[in-house]
C-alpha cells in the first residue's frame, strides 16, 4: 500500500532530486525506445492470463517520490557509520544553487519505505539528541546519499 505525506524540504534537496529525475528519465526514455512497454505488457499477460481480453494501459513516470524510493532502496544496507559519514559529507557539501526557498512536495511512497524512513529518525538520532531527527532531514540525507552514488 502507498501513502501520501507532505514533508517540507530544503531547496537543495529538490536540486538533488531533480538531477536524479533527469538521470532516471533518460534511462526510462532509452528503455521505452527499446520496447519496454511491449515487454511489460507481454510479461503482465503471461503472469496474469485472466487479463486476456482486458485493456491494459501501462504508464511509466519518474517523479520526486520515485527517486526517494530509489535512494532509499539503494542505501537500505547502510550502517550507522555509513550514515554518519554521509551526514558529514552532506554538511560539507557546498550548495552552488541560488535557490534558497524550501518546498513541500506531497510524497507518495510505499508503507515499507515510510516505515524505514521513520525508523531512521530514531536509529540515527545519536546519544546526545533529546528528540528524534526530523523526517525532512532524513529524506534530505537519503536523497544526498542516492545522489552521490
Q: Where are the regions that the model predicts?
A:
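Short Lys/Arg-rich basic patches
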Residues: 1-47, 55, 87-121, 125
Amino acid at each position: 500500500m502507498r501513502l501520501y505525506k507532505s514533508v517540507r524540504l530544503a531547496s537543495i534537496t529538490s536540486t538533488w532530486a531533480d538531477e536524479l529525475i533527469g538521470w532516471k528519465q533518460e534511462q526510462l526514455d532509452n528503455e521505452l525506445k527499446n520496447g519496454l512497454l511491449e515487454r511489460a505488457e507481454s510479461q503482465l499477460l503471461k503472469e496474469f492470463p485472466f487479463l486476456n481480453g482486458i485493456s491494459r494501459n501501462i504508464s511509466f513516470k519518474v517523479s520526486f517520490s520515485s527517486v526517494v524510493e530509489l535512494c532509499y532502496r539503494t542505501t537500505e544496507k547502510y550502517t550507522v557509520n555509513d550514515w554518519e559519514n554521509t551526514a558529514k559529507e552532506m554538511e560539507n557539501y557546498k550548495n552552488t544553487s541560488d535557490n534558497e526557498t524550501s518546498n513541500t512536495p506531497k510524497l507518495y511512497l510505499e508503507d515499507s519505505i515510510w516505515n524505514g524512513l521513520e525508523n531512521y529518525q530514531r536509529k540515527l538520532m545519536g546519544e546526545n539528541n533529546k528528540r528524534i531527527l526530523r523526517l525532512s532531514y532524513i529524506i534530505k540525507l537519503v536523497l544526498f546519499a542516492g545522489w552521490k552514488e
